[in-house]
Every structure is written in structure tokens, then in C-alpha cells.
Regions:
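ATP-dependent adenylate-handling active sites, centered on carboxylate activation for C-N bond formation
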Residues: 1-163, 182-231, 245, 249, ...
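Short linear sequence motifs
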Residues: 121, 132, 136, 163, ...
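Core structural elements
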Residues: 167-182
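Prokaryotic Sec-type signal peptides and long signal-anchor helices
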Residues: 173, 283, 291, 318, ...
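PAPS-dependent sulfotransferase catalytic core
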Residues: 229-312
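C-terminal non-catalytic accessory extensions
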Residues: 299-337
Length: 337
């Protein structure tokens, strides 16, 4: 099973520990992060055989696959047969049970002003927008469809309690697509997951329950309070704005959100790679009609690559839009003219 410094994988391993079995756990977080340190402390408390991944400067997905490959080598599991490998994973717990992305402000808006106002609040809180300076003026009207499409989907759930309707929006969009990339490449990794938080029975029970008790990981914290010692007192990594972990820990540990998962050197390399990808994307549209405002993108790439300013989000968005354009499919399904 994966065992990180968060709540999702810990809940799974805590339940597995109640059975008369030996448990192997894997943590592929970079050293010096809360994910790595808290995961190790949890493994000690739960008496698992724990492996930490020593590799450096790889992406999240690459570290995941590489850590499992290394684990199998260390356990001498290879018998010459190519096979599908399975591992318990806490994916889906944050949105499904912790209700990440859902806020009291969104709930209040949905209940007091209606789902149309809740859609606007979701767009703002989740930054579901495209920087308008990136888009040529004649195409900017297209992106008003973001709010419209969210509003239309929320209306599909109008028969539900408004707060739960908003949660279902995140379930049907973020949660449903969460593992898309992994399963698109499962033929390469040959790794499958046991996913308790995607179990239809668990999801149904959550959706039938009042939403307020789950907000900001409230239900999660109630569950953790019922754990036996010593695992109950091991710190965990909390989402920004959610109920904080009550246990003290070193302030020098890197936080997944505020500080980033990688260290400074790895982040610098990621930034260089992003700028390179941005220049490659710009080259694709240099001599073709496009929705992208090319001079602004060029200026952003130059400023970012020279570390004068950071336009990472801007460049990431541009790359995604250019990939859509150069696949000859535009937002209404027809080629761009």
C-alpha cells in the first residue's frame, strides 16, 4: 500500500493493520517533505515494512512507477512473468471524503442565492478562467462558456440539496478524471490500484449524507480521533484552510502546497522545462491563425526564462490551448479558421 504523510493512505493502512497480515508500504515523496517524514512515522506506528524512494528530480507519475519497480526488485518478486501489479491507494479521498474545493462560501451562495450564483463562486474560487491577455480579442467571448457550462451542469443536480449538488459537480469533474492519465498508460506501467475511495458503495453513502459535516475534512478528523494509539498521535499533512493537524512537528519540513513538493533545485529544473515546452508550443503556431496573442506569449516566455518575472500559470495555459488548436479540434468541434 502507498503510505504518504496525508490522511487518505493512512486511513487505508490503519484498516489493513487490523487484519492478521504483513503490510508492505511505499512512500515516493522527496526527502525533507511532510509527505516523506509523516509517512515514515506512520509506518513505525502501524508496524509496516516501509520503503522510501531515493530517486531525485522526477515527476510525480515517474516517481510513483519507479518506486514500485524498485520495491519489487527489493522484495525479489520477479519470477520472469510479466504481470499486472496492484497496490492499495488513497486516491480520491480528498475530494470524496475531505470535500476539497468545496467551501462554506460556495455552500452559502448555492443555498441563499441559487446555483447560478454558486457557479460564479466556483469559477472564482477555483480560478477556472483563461488569462484574457493570452487570447486575441476576437476570441475572448468563447471563454464565457466556462461559467455557462458549470451553471448548466449544476442545474442537472437541482433536485439535490444545493450544497451536495456543488460537491457532486467536483465529483463528476475532478474526481471522475483524477486517474485518467494513469489508466491511459496502464499498458506501460502495468500497475493497477485498489481504490476504496472510488468504491460505489462508499461514494453513495457520502452523497446521501448531509454535506456540512464533511466540509474542511471535519468527518476525516472525527475518524482519526477514533484511531488507537500510537497512530492517532502521528502528525499528518493538512490542506490549506482545512482543519489543522493538532500535533506539533518541525517547521523546516516542506509543505506540499505552500512550498511545493520538490526542493529548489528541482523546481528550477521544472521551470526551465516549462519554458522550453512553451517555446516549442509557440513555434507550432508561429505561422498559423490562432486564438493566442503571440507577442504577449513571447514576452511572458522571455521574462520567465530569464527569471525577471514568473508567468508559469500563463505559459501552462498557453501550452494546453495550443495543443488543442494544433490537434485541429476547436471548442465547438470544428477546425479553427
Amino acid at each position: 500500500a502507498f503510505l504518504s504523510g496525508g490522511m487518505d493512505s493512512r486511513w487505508i493502512v490503519e484498516i489493513l493493520s487490523k487484519f492478521p497480515i504483513s503490510i508492505d508500504t511505499i512512500n515516493f515523496a522527496p526527502f525533507g517533505t511532510k509527505d516523506q517524514v509523516f509517512g515514515k512515522l506512520a509506518s513505525i506506528a502501524l508496524s509496516t515494512s516501509h520503503m522510501e524512494y531515493p530517486g531525485e528530480n522526477l515527476s510525480f507519475a515517474d516517481r510513483l512507477v519507479d518506486s514500485i519497480n524498485l520495491f519489487e526488485l527489493s522484495k525479489v518478486h520477479h519470477n520472469g512473468i510479466s504481470r499486472l501489479r496492484t497496490i492499495w491507494s488513497g486516491d480520491g479521498g480528498s475530494v470524496g471524503v475531505g470535500h476539497v474545493y468545496l467551501t462554506k462560501e460556495i455552500l452559502d451562495e448555492a443555498r441563499q442565492s441559487g446555483l447560478d450564483c454558486a457557479a460564479k463562486k466556483i469559477v472564482v474560487s477555483q480560478k477556472y478562467h483563461v488569462p484574457m491577455k493570452l487570447v486575441r480579442e476576437k476570441y475572448r467571448h468563447i471563454f464565457s462558456a466556462i461559467y455557462k457550462s458549470i451553471h448548466e451542469e449544476l442545474n442537472l443536480y437541482a433536485s439535490l440539496e444545493p450544497g451536495r449538488a456543488c460537491h457532486l459537480f467536483f465529483m463528476m469533474n475532478d474526481q471522475r478524471r483524477h486517474l485518467f492519465s494513469h489508466y491511459e498508460n496502464i499498458h506501460k506501467s502495468r500497475i493497477d490500484f485498489f481504490l476504496p475511495f472510488f468504491d460505489s458503495r462508499m461514494v453513495l453513502n457520502i452523497l446521501k449524507s448531509p454535506v456540512d459535516g464533511f466540509l474542511y475534512h471535519r468527518f476525516y478528523n472525527e475518524v482519526f480521533n477514533r484511531f488507537a494509539e500510537p497512530i492517532r498521535s502521528v502528525p499528518w499533512q493538512s490542506y490549506p484552510g482545512h482543519i489543522k493537524c493538532p500535533f506539533s512537528y518541525s517547521e523546516n519540513l516542506r509543505d506540499q502546497w505552500a512550498d511545493g513538493w520538490m526542493d529548489n533545485n528541482a523546481r528550477k529544473k521544472e521551470k526551465i522545462l516549462l519554458c522550453r515546452q512553451g517555446f516549442v508550443a509557440l513555434k507550432k503556431i508561429l505561422f498559423r491563425k490562432t486564438i493566442i496573442h503571440k507577442p504577449y506569449l513571447m514576452a511572458s516566455l522571455l521574462l520567465s526564462s530569464t527569471n525577471l518575472r514568473s508567468y508559469d500559470y500563463f505559459i501552462e495555459t498557453a501550452i494546453k490551448l495550443i495543443n488543442i488548436e494544433t490537434s485541429d479540434i476547436f471548442f465547438d468541434g470544428s477546425p479553427l479558421t
